[in-house]
Design a protein with these regions (language model features):
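Alpha/beta enzyme core
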Residues: 4-6, 11, 35, 51-70, ...
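Short, small-residue-enriched loops and turns at beta-alpha junctions
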Residues: 42, 46-47, 76-80, 134-136, ...
């Protein structure tokens, strides 16, 4: 079977919500929602090998460290393993006083009772009950009328009320989900939720959580936002309800739907770290939280050590975090493209020069350092990279700040190596290539400095006297000029017949303090009009310039050969 030329014969577009005066498009997110992690329930039921108790406890500890205050810890009626874990956690003393655990149950008497039993001994807990309300479920799965489906919800609400009353030592809270809300009629969802509220009698001080799930994402995020706003505007006693969102990612817009849902009036978000969950996954709590953070809103969740968080999540779920996953992926802060690298490099340079803390670096919506990432991986070099890439790598790794024209010269060496190897070049590759290209090592060097002296003559000129190796043999040399650079150039001309003219000179410190070294760069012209570059590095800035001249001399000899 192949894709249809006319998919309209098989699929129908989702009907829009009649909400001509919608308000959510004009709103912004200015404060964080209540966060509920369902990693230990929805996330766990969606992995090939569900977590054992060791992994669940490790994941729970991680969520506590991040700052999640509401954690769904399981589906106790699913089996003895789930029940035992929940009971064990409740009695372990590991649940901080400011964290409320939650369990999920279907709207059946025996399952609800079992759920309350699993939470006996808890300081505070949320019991979350659900039943599906959409036409497909009513007509195909249950074969029930609207009223029959509503009575399931009402009966479940009465059980929540009565079971909680039997256990007054726990601070009980309730959550109701009209499952499949996003594909159900809004008037019916409102009718069912109002009936549940009539039973549980929530107040503004103790609201009922009404969770409105996109159980299967069926429309664009704006439609979901319309549904949420319509529901919020038409729910009686709205202040006694905390509107919660549980989006899925079937159409790839679970995060967007959750964000627009917040703008539409929701108070709470359910999801998983890095979007784990059934099918294409749940809303990613990391993405939503850090989206807020990059808009200047404190999400109340701490992802300062994101690599450690990823390590734990991957271990517990047995699933890798995609390298392109927003904020957490291995490659999300990495640029290979030359133009991107150049923009990022300039952005960092400008950031250092400004006196304000405002983050403005092209291609990086967040400072990687805020998440515990280093800058070394921001720019990586391959055959697609430009000058900005390797220049950044050298500066970050070695403190080398290449002049623009030297970047262009070195680019030929980097490009040639990248083409030869056919892979990404790491920092060691680039540093090794740089040292070889500018004769910072003995390999391939005709001239190498051993030692020297500079003296001042009575006429004001400078005399350079030194020992250099030429072809591996020591040779005493000397020359006179107006300064150190010119005296070394005179030495090369008089002793070896090398005519080199300095066109430009740059120097800077490598590091700070008394242990700082110096780097010197010389652009030089040869008699035939070609140019060569010399690079010198030494503890002493004067010696660095001498080494740079000999580096240029080595390049000149190589050109002649």
């Amino acid at each position: 079977m192949t894709m249809l030329q006319d998919p309209g014969r098989k699929y129908r577009p989702f009907p829009p919500v009649n909400l001509s005066d919608r308000q959510w498009p004009n709103r912004t997110i200015t404060h964080p929602p209540r966060w509920l992690s369902t990693d230990l329930r929805d996330g766990n039921q969606a992995i090939v090998d569900p977590m054992d108790a060791v992994k669940k406890n490790r994941f729970f500890d991680l969520l506590v460290q991040i700052g999640v205050k509401e954690i769904e810890i399981g589906f106790p009626a699913a089996g003895q393993t789930e029940f035992d874990f929940i009971q064990g956690l409740v009695h372990s003393g590991k649940i901080p006083d400011d964290i409320t655990v939650q369990v999920l149950t279907q709207a059946r008497k025996d399952l609800i009772q079992r759920s309350f039993e699993s939470l006996e001994g808890a300081r505070a807990a949320i019991v979350h009950v659900y039943n599906a309300v959409s036409p497909a479920w009513r007509e195909i799965v249950f074969r029930m009328t609207r009223d029959e489906v509503k009575q399931i919800a009402v009966g479940a609400a009465k059980l929540l009320r009565d079971e909680a009353a039997k256990r007054p030592d726990t601070d009980w809270h309730f959550e109701y989900s009209p499952e499949t809300f996003s594909t159900a009629e809004l008037d019916f969802s409102l009718d069912v939720c109002e009936a549940v509220m009539d039973v549980l009698r929530p107040t503004k001080e103790r609201p009922l959580i009404l969770n409105l799930p996109a159980t299967v994402e069926a429309a664009t995020p704006n439609v979901y936002a319309d549904q949420i706003e319509y529901f919020c505007r038409n729910l009686p006693n709205r202040e006694a309800a905390a509107i919660s969102l549980h989006t899925h990612n079937d159409r790839g817009t679970g995060v967007a739907a959750a964000e627009l849902g917040l703008m539409a009036g929701a108070d709470r978000i359910e999801g998983c770290l890095f979007g784990n969950g059934e099918r294409t996954g749940n809303c990613c709590l990391v993405t939503v939280a850090l989206n807020m953070y990059t808009q200047g809103v404190d999400p109340g969740l701490d992802f300062s050590e994101i690599d450690r968080i990823i390590e734990t999540v991957e271990y517990c779920n047995g699933l890798p975090v995609h390298p392109r996953h927003p904020y957490g992926g291995e490659l999300v802060f990495t640029a290979f493209s030359g133009s991107h690298q150049d923009a990022i490099k300039k952005g960092f340079e400008a950031q250092e020069m400004r006196n304000d803390e405002l983050w403005r670096v092209p291609y990086l919506p967040i400072d990687p350092a805020d998440l515990g990432r280093t800058y070394e991986a921001v720019i990586r070099v391959n055959s697609q990279s430009g000058k900005g890439g390797f220049a950044w790598v050298l500066e970050q790794g070695q403190g080398i700040k290449l002049p623009k024209k030297l970047q262009a010269d070195f680019a030929h060496h980097v490009q040639r190596l990248a083409d030869e190897l056919g892979r990404e070049l790491d920092a060691d590759d680039i540093w090794r290539t740089f040292r070889k290209a500018y004769y910072l090592d003995r390999d391939g060097a005709t001239f190498e400095l051993v030692d020297y002296e500079e003296t001042r003559a009575s006429d004001g000129t400078r005399l350079f006297t030194g020992t250099i190796t030429v072809g591996g043999k020591h040779q005493q040399v000397s020359g006179r000029g107006k300064g150190l650079v010119s005296s070394v150039l005179a030495t090369l001309q008089q002793t070896f017949g090398l005519e080199i003219e300095v066109l430009d000179y740059f120097e800077h410190a490598l590091g700070k303090g008394t242990d700082a070294r110096a780097a010197a760069y010389l652009e030089c012209s040869l008699p035939d009009g070609s140019t060569v570059w010399g690079v010198g590095i030494d503890e002493d800035v004067a010696t660095a310039s001498v080494r740079a001249i000999l580096s240029a001399a080595n390049a000149a000899v190589a050109v002649e050969v």
